[in-house]
Amino acid sequence: MNEKYTVKAVFSDIDGTLLTRDHVVTELTRTEIHKITNNGILFTLASSRSPAGIEPIIRKNTFNCCMIAFGGGLILDEDRKIIYEKGMDIYMAGKVIEYIEKNCADVTWNIFTADTWIVKDRSDQRVQHEEQVVETSAKMGTIKDLKPYACVDKILCMCAPQKLSETEQAVRQAFPNLSVAKSSNTLLEIMQQGVNKAEAVKRLCEIKGIRMEYTMAFGDNYNDLEMLEAVKYGVAMGNAPEAIQKKAAIVTKDHENDGIAYILE
């Protein structure tokens, strides 16, 4: 770890941050992450992905790390034990799905629990693309396929870039008590109120006995902003929107040029 920073915990977003456009971790970045974990620094992947979508990255790169999934709705420790979960109940999730189908044209919904990914149509090209990116498969179904007491960790909306802001505004107005955040120019995350990466980072640090003044985080998008502002050293990637870069404490190189390693080495 760079001697300029006194850090005991490092948190990293995945897509657009840890991974290149080819969805891989570079050798240099992998090496630097191994170095910090070998030196006793807590490393955690903080993503909007499901645990099943995060696990292949951990396995391929032999990371010893915790996992923040669903944009902060679920935390798993190094042994993949759930240590925190905050999601919607079935009734609320059903109301959101009903609203999307009635009011948001050409928007594909996805329902996520800790171990299930349900979609209306697996032949949808947007779903197929997401399956390839996260290396896991969705199941066709409806909200009724879940058990009555299930915890819905996230509803993901997929739409064209030009429809994203419109969809976000509509969902926010219809459900002011839910957390709504863009994770890319085509993806909208809908979660329980109070769910975000920053709150999950704080919760994990509390569990691990680490003070926030010893934390660092890397991110590239709007759903990372609260996390970047919550930690001591918030690092925006060089490929992040200008608005994110302006609010971050540090700006590094982009995800194609080892932005994480540049700060850690």
What do the PLM-derived regions correspond to, one by one?
Residues 40-44, 63-65, 153-154, 213-214, ...:
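Short active-site oxyanion
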Residues 61-63, 71, 174-176, 230-231, ...:
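Short, structured coil segments at secondary-structure junctions
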Residues 106-218, 225, 230, 239:
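Conserved acidic, metal-coordinating active-site core of Asp-based
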Residues 2-9, 25-26, 189-265:
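Mg2+-dependent phosphoryl-transfer enzymes with acidic/Ser/Thr/Gly-rich catalytic loops
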Residues 36, 47, 71, 155, ...:
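Residue-level signal for inorganic ion chemistry
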Residues 64-70, 179-181, 234-238, 252-253:
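Short hydrophobic/aromatic-enriched beta-strand-loop microsegments
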Residues 24-126:
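Active-site phosphate-binding/coordination module
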Residues 6-22:
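Asp-based phosphoryl-transfer active-site loop
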